[in-house]
Amino acid sequence: WDTFSHTPGKVDNGDTGDVACDHYHRWPEDLGIAGQLGLDAYRFSIAWPRIVPQADGRVNQAGLDFYDRLTDSLLEKGITPFPTLYHWDLPQAQQDRGGWPVRETAERFGEYAEVVAAALGDRITNWATLNEPLCSAWIGHLDGNMAPGLKDLTAAVRASYHLHLGHGLAVQALRAAIPNASIGIVNNLSPVHPATDSESDRLAAQRGDGHINRWWLDPILGRGYPQDMVELYGVELPVHPGDMELISAPLDWIGLNYYFRQIVTGDTTGPAPHFRQVPGPNVEHTAMDWEVHGPGLEQLLLRLTDDYGVQKIYVTENGSAYQDTVGADGSVHDPERTEYLEQHLAACARAVSKGAPLAGYFAWSLLDNFEWAYGYDKRFGLVHVDYKTQQRTVKTSGRRYAELAAAHRLRGRRAA
């Protein structure tokens, strides 16, 4: 991503992630804010390039030391660490050797997981292997809008497979090093609906569901790759003996990232997967132009519960971007985000009442941050960041979220 963000035309406004919200230097202040908001868990990612920057496996101890300090401080504050091993930041040296389309990257990821587990496993129980592998594979290798910026179906499918294999190898490494580890994977999922009742749109919705949801759930939950999508992609999966057993190793929980539903129509003008998203009917959209649709979160929680038999779920990301501004009094009023949070927490409460084993909810995000290809224009944080001064200001949504976190209750109902 460092290389990608420094490539002209890849990120809005020419923004890069060089400094972003400078959490690397300001983490004590940021954890202090998390404590003030009453958060009892903190989800963060560990940067593979900080730990093993080169392809030779040499460990950068300074990188590990940062996460060591972060972990100890979280525990001192009574905040449970929830690290993710991979949030899209592949070492450039590994990309130069082929990246996720080649098997070596999955193997190196397993070795990196061993290093991190050995360093932090004595204090951290809860682990996620991958965050939104769909984005790494489909958006990075098929759509070309994220690193490494390819538009190659074969590379995308092979990347998806090796991401799953890397997940399995990481699970193996974590289990070996941390006997009491609670391990999951984080997928961004969306309910997919046909735009009309036509056969073409219904088939498009089936393909969309396969591309967005089933391809990412079925293999890790023991169902194998969905055959309709294997045939649609027409790319041979590079399966070796024993791979599928690794990929489908038992997990302790599933992480669900939810932002919007997808309404689709058929589109066979380009390569697979032959569907195109169309605008939803709701008039309310976020600054990302994403439709606000809380019931979709309830639907996904119940699908994981009823269709897949998942025994423990975390909502690992849910949030919204709006055009926040700092008022003359120095405060940031964002009633739209507050309403968004309450609507989606209500969806969680409904799902729990219907049997969903929801164990926790993480808002995206604590701070405004570098929003990948969108740069710094899109603000998701409960805390406003002035990128020129790095001043943090808790938004009104952050204060409301703190109230909800303290009460575990929303409008008379117990929230997740």
What are these regions (language model features)?
Residues 1-60, 64, 70-73, 77:
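N-terminal structural segment of carbohydrate-active enzymes
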Residues 2-11, 54-55, 65-416:
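Active-site region of glycoside hydrolase catalytic domains
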